[in-house]
Regions:
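Short C-terminal tail/terminal secondary-structure segment
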Residues: 285-288, 432-433, 437-451
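Substrate-binding pocket helix/loop in short-chain dehydrogenase/reductase
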Residues: 289-291, 295-300
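Active-site loop immediately N-terminal to the catalytic Tyr-X3-Lys motif
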Residues: 292, 340-346, 368, 413, ...
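Active-site helix of classical SDR
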Residues: 314, 351, 359
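Alpha-helical segment proximal to the catalytic Tyr-Lys
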Residues: 319, 364-365, 434
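Residue(s) in the substrate-gating loop at a strand-loop-helix junction
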Residues: 335
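Short, small/polar-rich loop/turn modules that mediate ligand/substrate recognition or access, typified
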Residues: 367, 372, 436-438
Length: 451
């Protein structure tokens, strides 16, 4: 009842409806892509924070209206709506992009107010959680996607409250001393001294191509399980609803289209702030065809999907990887056909071998930027969309084997699954492979021809 009374009072006094300039609405809809600038900005914030962060960008009309408010420099620096918001949002947003100045101001704020207590306080990280920038819009920061979303929700409410209070009379936050006391109360300090078992990829972003099924989907699951935010690209529209969670973004994307790749990367930058890890998995395995019956059109189609599209993705993701707070990493899903090609697979084998060479050259060129690339060569992974039960039975019968024997037809006599491949792809982006680049690792249970 009290809330309704307050809302009615604001409405009666012309302070409830927040007006948005038509010019700002047009500007928000036509905002230019700033993916590389956003990734570099995320790198700067992560450096001040001391850990990788998720950076979400909003340049819609409502956010732009607040960011471009004539008095934003005063209104936004009053403090949070309630002192407890400070735990999520910090006391005030960063205005503009000068993260270093924000760090200095935060350290000064801590020194001044920590003197009032006899307790020995540990300063929290001095990175902003909310940024208001004329070019980027409203940005929110978190150690994971959910945290960044919570900060966003809180500050959306804060913007509305500030604008309505200003329209009515004046916005007045709680005293800075009260805000500091909540930010540095005992429980929050105790959390700092607890051993934090953060996931391996907390605050980092992985991009996986061909992510709607098979090895690609398993890669998404493996990276999510390690705490990464994951962007999945696939030509199958099912990718958009693959997982309903804040740390996953599925984008329908034809990887042979440069413009669709650009759009996907723009959306990635706006949603999470960058890319730290790349898994190149998308590709096709055509039906067997010998060289004497292989048309140039078929050859070019396979090369376009398995090779050319990966070149475009690598080229366009490179600036993201270069700006990764913990250095960029790439896992490439190769094939047993690179070291051991088979008859009837000329185009596929050649495309995978060419991708292998591309990765090796990239390792040479990108090493100076701290980016590492490693290659997995799987074989006989049967739990993918390529293999139906009928096809499995036919291939097993061709070799005079049962389906189970066919699945385990390797020197270790074990089955290799999509999850096995995905787990290795994820570990290759982890600390165990920190000093390794351009490695080629078979994951096939031991193929005699590869050995």
């Amino acid at each position: 009842a009290l809330v309704s009374q307050a809302e009615n009072y604001l409405e009666e006094h012309g302070a409830w409806q927040i007006t948005i300039s038509p010019l700002l609405l047009t500007a928000a809809l036509s905002a230019k892509p700033l993916r590389q600038e956003i990734a570099t900005f995320r790198q700067a914030i992560s450096k001040v924070a001391g850990f990788p962060v998720i950076l979400a960008t909003y340049n819609d009309a409502e956010a732009s209206s607040f960011v471009h408010h004539a008095d934003v420099a005063t209104l936004s620096q009053q403090g949070p709506v309630t002192p407890d918001h400070v735990i999520r949002t910090k006391r005030v947003p960063l205005l503009g992009k000068d993260v270093e100045s924000y760090r200095i101001a935060y350290e000064t704020y801590f020194k001044e107010h920590s003197k009032r207590t006899e307790l020995s306080l540990t300063m929290l990280d001095p990175a902003p959680r909310v940024i208001l920038d004329a070019e980027f819009g409203l940005l929110t920061v978190g150690r994971n996607a959910q945290e960044a979303n919570i900060v966003h929700d809180m500050y959306r409410h804060t913007m509305a409250i500030i604008l309505r209070a200003t329209a009515l009379e004046k916005y007045q936050a709680q005293p800075i001393t009260d805000v500091f006391d909540v930010e540095y109360w005992e429980l929050e300090q105790a959390k700092l001294h607890l051993k934090q078992n953060l996931p391996m990829f907390a605050g980092e972003i992985a991009l996986v191509t061909g992510a709607a099924s098979g090895i690609g989907k398993a890669c998404v699951e493996s990276f999510l399980a390690r705490g990464a935010a994951v962007v999945g690209l696939d030509i199958n529209p099912a990718i958009e609803k693959l997982f309903d969670r804040p740390d996953f973004l599925g984008i329908r994307c034809n990887l042979t289209s440069e413009s669709e790749i650009y759009q996907a990367l723009d959306k990635t930058a706006k949603t999470f702030g960058g890319i730290d890890m790349l898994v190149l998995n998308a590709g096709i395995f055509p039906s067997a065809k010998r060289i004497d019956s292989l048309s140039l059109d078929e050859w070019r189609k396979i090369m376009n999907i398995n090779l050319d599209s990966n070149l475009i993705v690598m080229r366009e993701v490179y600036p993201f990887l270069k700006a990764a707070p913990k250095r960029g990493r790439v896992s490439i899903i190769g094939s047993k056909n690179v070291p051991a090609p088979g008859p009837g697979a000329a185009a596929y084998s050649a495309s995978k071998a060419a991708l292998n060479q591309l990765a090796r050259v990239a390792a040479l060129e990108w090493g100076k930027d701290g980016i590492r690339l490693n290659i997995l060569h799987p074989n006989a992974v049967f739990d993918t969309g390529l293999w139906t039960e009928e096809l499995l039975q036919a291939r097993a019968a061709h070799y005079g084997l049962t389906v189970e024997a066919y699945k385990t037809n390797n020197v270790m006599q074990i089955e290799v699954t999509s999850r096995d491949v995905a787990e290795l792809a994820a570990e290759m982006c982890g600390p165990l492979f920190a000093k390794t680049t351009a490695a080629q690792v078979p994951i096939d249970g031991g193929n005699e021809r590869v050995i």
